[in-house]
A protein has these predicted regions:
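Signal peptide processing junction and immediate N-terminal pro/mature segment
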Residues: 18-25
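Bacterial N-terminal signal peptides
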Residues: 7-17
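N-terminal segment of the mature folded domain
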Residues: 25-118
């Protein structure tokens, strides 16, 4: 199972495991995304549009901050953990180590764009 780490904003819903088997017999029918509060407004719009224009449910987006999102993402694999995290920075080596220790392997980091506050 691959989980995604998205750098900047989350537009790569197509890469997430929509019906990924998590725990024995457990599944969810939506994508769970956590992360950056600066990316939250854009990610919400993209998620709503995705839900309207695809055969999938609208992803659930939570604003937890980049660090908080990565902490949740790296905590483990299964329906109780998010599928994707948005961050306004790159993943740290220590976060990668935590992910690997908790069974979150094959992380894919995708740079979607840049953000900024003016």
């Amino acid at each position: 199972m691959k989980k995604l780490f998205l750098f900047a904003v989350s537009l790569a819903f197509e890469f997430a495991g929509f019906a990924t088997p998590a725990a024995a017999g457990a599944s969810r029918d939506y994508i769970s995304i956590v992360g950056s509060s600066t990316e939250y407004p854009f990610a919400t719009v993209v998620a709503e549009q995705f839900g309207k224009t695809s055969r999938f449910k609208t992803p659930k987006i939570e604003s937890t901050g980049s660090g908080g999102g990565l902490k949740l993402f790296c905590a483990g694999v299964g329906v109780e953990h998010p599928d994707i995290t948005n961050a306004s920075r790159r993943i740290k080596k220590s976060e990668c180590d935590t992910c690997n220790k908790n069974g979150v392997k094959d992380i894919v980091e995708i740079k979607i764009g840049y953000d900024g506050i003016v």
